[in-house]
Amino acid sequence: MLFRAMGYVIAAFYRFVHLHNYYDMKPVILEFCLSRGIKGTVILAEQGINATIAGSRQSIGEFFSFLDSDDRLRGMKYHESHSDREPFAKMKVRLKREVVRLGIDGFDCSLRGEYIDPRDWDEFVSSPDVHVIDTRNDYEVRLGRFKGAIDPGTSSFREFPEWARNWALDKERDTCVAMYCTGGIRCEKSTAFMRSLGFRNVYHLRGGILNYLETMRGDDSLWEGECFVFDDRIAVDRNVSPSEDIKCIKCAGEVDASDLRSVSKGNIMCWDCRLQA
């Protein structure tokens, strides 16, 4: 496979849409990706699609043209980033009960809150009346977050509903809440959950942290640190380039792509510290 100078094109996307035949879609999508050398993960559920894939510029373009053949997936917007090294080892298409697991059956994702565009985000969340909530896992938050954001301290997204219910106990339902995540899907679903609890003023960052960093590239912003990503890059910096300075949580030594297996469990540790754990 030939790649242009900037290397692999990485596309992250999702859509909440009813896919009654998602079981039948799996082999079709898998065969298409394998035939074009695309690698990554596509999650299919009755409530929609969630994916991050990587390949050549041509193959990624062909993939989205392929999605356009399905009216439900036509015009899919995606966040694009790049890597000089291959971000994924294989291509996987997984069937799930939820495209991102919140653990609540029959949950209405259409209740989502209002979008805030990246250029408007800093001003919006700087208001003392806005409660900014990071909906990601604790090990992601440790690498970086927006200044002043609330860290729920959850180890998985399934723990978020319990945290949110407890947090909401002493909050007025007209409290203004702004939420964010990596690419937009978790914060979109979590805003819907907050609205189901009765909160009326609920907002989320359009396209998540990745879209924010891409939009604000080179500008001063409220983002601090690195952004964890679920591929061999481990994290990206404020320029959306693969991070070169990821530290082990035990010894503060450098963690590289070969240590990714430890990151998958939320333990950002170098190999030596893993052996001693």
Curated annotation (Swiss-Prot):
InterPro entries: Rhodanese-like_dom, Rhodanese-like_dom_sf, TrhO, TRHO_N. One of its GO terms (biological process) is tRNA modification. Keywords: Oxidoreductase, tRNA processing. It is an enzyme of class 1 (oxidoreductase). It catalyses: uridine(34) in tRNA + AH2 + O2 = 5-hydroxyuridine(34) in tRNA + A + H2O. Residues 126-221 form the Rhodanese domain. The active site is at 181 (cysteine persulfide intermediate). It comes from the Bacteria. Pfam families: Rhodanese, UPF0176_N. One of its GO terms (molecular function) is oxidoreductase activity, acting on paired donors, with incorporation or reduction of molecular oxygen. Disulfide bonds: none annotated. CDD domains: RHOD_YceA (cd01518). Its EC number is 1.14.-.-. Belongs to the TrhO family. Catalyzes oxygen-dependent 5-hydroxyuridine (ho5U) modification at position 34 in tRNAs. PANTHER family: RHODANESE-LIKE DOMAIN-CONTAINING PROTEIN 7-RELATED, THIOSULFATE SULFURTRANSFERASE/RHODANESE-LIKE DOMAIN-CONTAINING PROTEIN 2. NCBIfam families: PRK00142.1-4 (NF001136). This is tRNA uridine(34) hydroxylase. It comes from Anaplasma marginale (strain St. Maries). The gene is trhO.
